[in-house]
Amino acid sequence: MKLTLRVWRQKNADAPGTMSTYEVDGISQDMSFLEMLDTLNEELILAGDDPVAFDHDCREGICGACSLVINGDAHGPERTTTCQLHMRSFEDGDTIDIEPWRASAFPVVKDLVVDRSAFDRIIQAGGYISAPTGTAPEAHAAPVPKPDADFAFEHAECIGCGACVAACPNGSAMLFTSAKINHLNVLPQGAPERETRVLDMVGQMDSEGFGGCTLTGECATACPKGIPLPSISAMNKEWLRATRKVRR
Amino acid sequence: MTRTLWDSSLGKKTVMAVSGLIMLLYLVVHMIGNLKIFFGSGEFNHYAHWLRTMGEPFLHYEWALWIVRVVLVAAVVLHAVSAYQLSRRDIRARPAKYVHRKPRASYATRTMRWGGIILGLFIVWHILDLTTGTVHPGGFQSGHPYQNVIDTFSTWYGNTIYIVAMLALGLHVQHGFWSAAQTLGAGSATRDRVLKTIANALAAVLTLGFICVPVAVMTGVVS
């Protein structure tokens, strides 16, 4: 396959960026999208140019490191992570636009790499449970009803990649935050911090400068792990419940 | 708790949802009242007069009407202020646009902000036209709403403004009702289909219910 790539190049956080055009040849349909970028970078390095910086880690679709907006879609045309996207999803001769996640809470570090530490701070605000130290407790000590376990698991699938924020026209992190809150709030292990968790995590989300939800549904469409849109409504319900319960 | 609500984006959205639902409830009542025009000037004018005497003798003349007006003005102001502040926040959160753009979301979703502004302007015109009579075409007669309605819908601009605004209303209600339900925590995988159906039905019924009045005047069904 021969492709034309238009890639966002930006030297650092303060430098202005621009779309640069590159030609790549000899791309196999079985390559992943990241392997295709590796091929481009090898050519750039041989030519003495600066390789394109992009985030990646496990390349197995479970770490949440990869993060590209491909032809206007977060993680590209398939509903998966960029590392699991293969070149068979494209045609020979295609022009592909590659851009970083766009949100003021995710500033560009270099080229296609953005700083997603805002998500870490949201987790630090309440995305944990109070657990006693020592040996692991008996697994059956805290019974969990099957529907609750399923609900928790569905939301625990979130890998924190940030595609929801990238896809949202308001740069909102509500799908991410709701996945993390719902995952723990439905379980008995998460009960001690149920109210403070939702209030603190939503508070942190607001102060990081993420936008609000206008129910466009773009986040749930882009999510490689299929976190559903009603998650946000479940979080709103938890938040309203917590504001009634907690006096601060 | 008031502080928690107003300082949080979720709290402001709650304010928007509740004030929106109050206005929506009013609109349903308003539309049903409007339809009385099809039963002739006697019934319509009698109904309009009852709006002023409702609640008597417990409430004084027009007190109930003024209570409704105060609640509605509060709802409009809260709705508009939170919409403005939330929109500012949303625009700040996404300053850089993608080079590769795709048309996304439904028309109703994309037109919520401009649609809201159109509706705000419409409300001002509507009150100046049929409540105070300031911009009413022909002589505004206080206490003769049937004749006033026919005057307004006998002008091309009266019909145009009204019908455009009612189409905007339908779009606004379609996305707004659904969003309000989600904001108040009513959404779930099983309930979302029902909520969307209710939103679509409310939007269609309100739009058609309001628009049939100018259409009836234009076609001479009501004269």
What is each of the regions a protein language model found here?
Chain A
Residues 20-32:
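Short, contiguous acidic and Ser/Thr-rich linear segments
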